[in-house]
């Protein structure tokens, strides 16, 4: 099986693929202080819970694909693959890795690996033109041309960042639970804040996507808009522009990049 690891700023998502099918997944907190040994222990605990894998670290794993937005974690995971997975082929997404998607940016090396991986999956699953909206620590909007090229995007503060900022900077406000309010017009402070977050972000998505579509394609209706990320469900029901929801888009992209970089016997 293929182990895929997507390290974000807040959470790390892991997925196990049996062929093209994702058969297991986990979400854990990202901690830049974890060493390679600590990560190995964590992986062994997760892997040991799966009935198709052995209790020893590496049993049943035939390949590994990793992307990370936290450089220190990527370094430690590199050590994990080297020390604990032996001869198992590993692909770490960094400059030089074949993705199959041209990156039309001023400095391609500065684009987050997860954003490129999302574009890879979007091209494979839906074709271009497309826009990927990833609801993570930041909310990112990434554009794929009709020819399957990554052409750039938008980075905005994420939902959790906005909630925390309201609680920290607002003298009479506090951190709230992320939940849909009963109505747009809040009847108390918590509901009013929840409404601002949910409907404010839905409006942001609709507005940004509408502008991106005009730049991306002659006919905006040709553009497929894909939502992904852990916080996507908060906005899905309120946005009018999202066509597809694929929660495992990044993991699928990692599988595709692994296959394009590891030759099969």
From Swiss-Prot:
Pathway: Cofactor biosynthesis; coenzyme A biosynthesis; CoA from (R)-pantothenate: step 1/5
Subcellular location: Cytoplasm
Enzyme class: transferase
Catalyzed reactions: (R)-pantothenate + ATP = (R)-4'-phosphopantothenate + ADP + H(+)
UniProtKB keywords: ATP-binding, Coenzyme A biosynthesis, Cytoplasm, Kinase, Metal-binding, Nucleotide-binding, Potassium, Transferase
Domain of life: Bacteria
One GO CC term, this protein: cytoplasm
Biological processes per GO annotation: coenzyme A biosynthetic process
Amino-acid positions noted as binding K(+) in the UniProt annotation, renumbered to this chain: 134
Signal peptide: none
Residues that, per the record, bind ATP: 6-13, 137
Molecular function GO labels: ATP binding; metal ion binding; pantothenate kinase activity
Enzyme Commission no: 2.7.1.33
CDD domains, per database record: ASKHA_NBD_PanK-III
Free-text cofactor note: A monovalent cation. Ammonium or potassium.
Segments passing through the bilayer: none
Active site: 114 (proton acceptor)
Pfam family, one: Pan_kinase
Needed cofactors: NH4(+); K(+)
Family indicated by similarity: Belongs to the type III pantothenate kinase family.
Subunit note: Homodimer.
Family annotation (NCBIfam families): baf, PRK13318.1-3, PRK13321.1
Annotated function: Catalyzes the phosphorylation of pantothenate (Pan), the first step in CoA biosynthesis.
Name of the protein described by the UniProt record: Type III pantothenate kinase
Organism: Streptomyces griseus subsp. griseus (strain JCM 4626 / CBS 651.72 / NBRC 13350 / KCC S-0626 / ISP 5235)
Lineage: Bacteria, Bacillati, Actinomycetota, Actinomycetes, Kitasatosporales
Gene designation: coaX
């Amino acid at each position: 099986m293929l182990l895929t690891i997507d390290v974000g700023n807040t959470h790390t998502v892991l997925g196990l693929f049996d062929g093209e099918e994702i058969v297991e997944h986990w979400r854990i907190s990202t901690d830049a202080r974890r060493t390679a040994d600590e990560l190995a222990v964590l992986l062994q605990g997760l892997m040991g819970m799966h009935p198709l894998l052995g209790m020893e670290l590496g049993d049943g794993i035939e390949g590994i694909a990793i992307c990370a937005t936290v450089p220190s974690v990527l370094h430690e995971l590199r050590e994990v693959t080297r020390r604990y997975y032996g001869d198992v082929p590993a692909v770490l997404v960094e400059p030089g890795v074949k993705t199959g998607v041209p990156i039309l940016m001023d400095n391609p090396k500065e684009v987050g690996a997860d954003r490129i991986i999302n574009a890879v999956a979007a091209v494979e699953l839906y074709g271009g033109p497309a826009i990927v909206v990833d609801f993570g620590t930041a909310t990112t909007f990434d554009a794929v041309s009709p020819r399957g090229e990554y052409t750039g995007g938008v980075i905005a503060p994420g939902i959790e960042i906005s909630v925390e900022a309201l609680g920290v900077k607002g003298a009479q406000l506090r951190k709230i639970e992320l939940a849909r309010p009963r109505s747009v017009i809040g009847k108390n402070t918590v509901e009013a804040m929840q409404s601002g977050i949910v409907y404010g972000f839905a409006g942001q998505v609709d507005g940004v996507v509408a502008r991106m579509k005009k730049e991306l394609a002659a006919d905006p209706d040709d553009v497929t808009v894909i939502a992904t990320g852990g916080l996507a469900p908060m906005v899905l029901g309120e946005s009018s522009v999202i066509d597809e929801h694929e929660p495992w888009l990044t993991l699928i992209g990692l599988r595709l990049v692994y296959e394009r970089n590891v030759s099969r016997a």
